[in-house]
Each structure stands twice: as structure tokens, then as C-alpha cells.
Amino acid sequence: IKRLIEQVSFEARTNEFVDKKSGVSARLTIAAYEAAVSSAERRAIIHGQSNTQVWISDLSGIIPAITGKIELVYEGEQEGPYEVALNLLNKSIRSIFVTYFPNPDDVKKRKAPKKSANAPEQKQPENPYAAIAKWFDAGNHLDLFLDMKDEDKIIELYKVDGLFGIVKKHFPQAGEKQSALLMEFVLHGLSSYSIISKKMIDGKIEFNDMMGSMINLGDMGMDDDAFNDYA
């Protein structure tokens, strides 16, 4: 979580919508971290829990901290502070994700080995995210409410085929809650690489397959912006 928040500051310093002359406030990282912790504490109070952990979904609470600590150029103002902040957060997730898990772009670029009449059949390159993508492609979707209990969130995350498997493969020593946090991170990471879709609406983050998400938006006559889609 700390690395993601720190990365937001780095992304802001190179973003085309952020005013380079005014710079990025040194307090952005501190303010954002405090906001994320506050979101987690609020959820614990709602459910009468004595402790909880900061989830990736709690980072939705750092948006005001980001918008309050950066100055935008004219194009950024036209885009909207909220959208710029979401974009920075998404780029942060995208950048950090590949330091923990295989790069989805590399997976997309893999080509099947060429067949030869005399050579034995070669095994297809493994796609570590195939099971996850297939689960969503089958019409499944996952709703993670911002205020849901830790236990309920963990149950929901384990419903996604292949999600625990990839975390266990790369972090075999992770405990239950740490694994669940990494599982949530995988979903956000895959959405940042357009493997699955993600949108926030009505106090929840909904993960879906890319095609189904586009069809639903088309049926309702609305575009991504109407849902603050930041996948």
C-alpha cells in the first residue's frame, strides 16, 4: 500500500495534466496515506471491529488528498481533477503491479511455437492469468463494497478461479489476509492492463469481463465516463 501511494507522487510529477511549475506538494504522500488509513478505520468502526487492514479499495479514499496537493494545467482542469487523480492512481497500480507479478503485456505478446512436420509438438506458453480471465469471460462478476467486512471480502475474492493460485505461486509464505490483499491487487492490476474491467459505482468496485462491460454500457446508452470507469 505504501509503495502504491508513493508511486502516485512519482506519476504526478511526470503527468501531462499536472502543472510542472507548481510541482507536487511534498505532503501528497503523507496526506494520501492518512486518508487510506482513515478509510480503513471508518470501516472498522462501522462493523465494530477492533482492527482491520488497509485494502487496495481503500485507496479510493485518497482521491481528495491527491486533488488537494497537485496543481493542474488548463487541459487537466478540462479533464477534471477527479479524473486526473483516478488516472494517477491507476498508473501507480500499473507500475507497481509488474514488480510483484508477471507483466500482462508480455503475456499478450507471447506467440505459440511454430509447428514443424518433423519436430515434436511443443507446449503452448503458459498464461498465468488465463483462469482468472476465463472466470470473468464466463459471465461472472465480482462486487467489492468499500465498507464490507474483511471476512466478507476474503470470501468474495476466493470465488474467482485462479486468483489465489497465482498469489500462492509468487508469495507462498503469505498469510490469509496478506494473500487476500494480494488477490485484490491482482484484480486491480489486471484491470489497469485491460484484461478485465473495473468501475466504481454506488460505494462498490465492480470487476467484470471487458466485453461484457462494454456491452452493458452500450445497452444503457452511457459511456465509461458516466460511471467514472477507471479501468
Regions found by a protein language model. Give the residues of each.
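C-terminal engagement/docking regions of AAA+ P-loop ATPases
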Residues: 21, 41-231
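Conserved AAA+ ATPase small/helical "lid" subdomain
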Residues: 1-54
